[in-house]
Amino acid sequence: MPPDRIVSGTYICAAAITRSQIVLENPPEGELKAFLEVYRKMGGQYKGNSGKLLVNGKNVQSPVKLLETSVYPGFPTDLQSPVMAVLSTIEGESCIREMVFEDRYKAADQLRKMGARIRVQGNEAVICGVKTLHGAAVQAQELRGGASLILAALGAKGVTVLEGYSFVQRGYCLLYTSDAADEGLG
């Protein structure tokens, strides 16, 4: 299967929200340009090397004044929810302006259950980052919003219970599940 820019971006968000490092093999680095610019604004670092992308999220701590979604090659609307989860953990105020789809902030209500401070008005979401999110019972209502809830759970203290995981499985075949662990894949 060819590398996917949305899946790659989501994994980079996992490194960002956990303030850790990962290596992506054969990512579509050229297609990630707009996303990587935002990642760098947040304080993330990356380096391409021999078909690998070395990603360091340890210094992700800067809010993003304004992030606007756009059609390719702009910032992908499908990475807006995952980035919202990351911005929820960066102290300071960030703003996302959704320019592609209406009603794209379904994950915001669920992230609020985890302690995120997000105000949605029309096509804008203002995120006032908090130091730490906390676990909660949350409901995925669509694929990318569900991915953002998993990311938030990775960066949260406590247990998060996610209902609606089947939405997420449609787009992320290698996320950890008990079945994958039983087969030695987790």
What are these regions (language model features)?
Residues 180-186:
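A short, hydrophobic C-terminal helix/tail in secreted or cell-surface proteins
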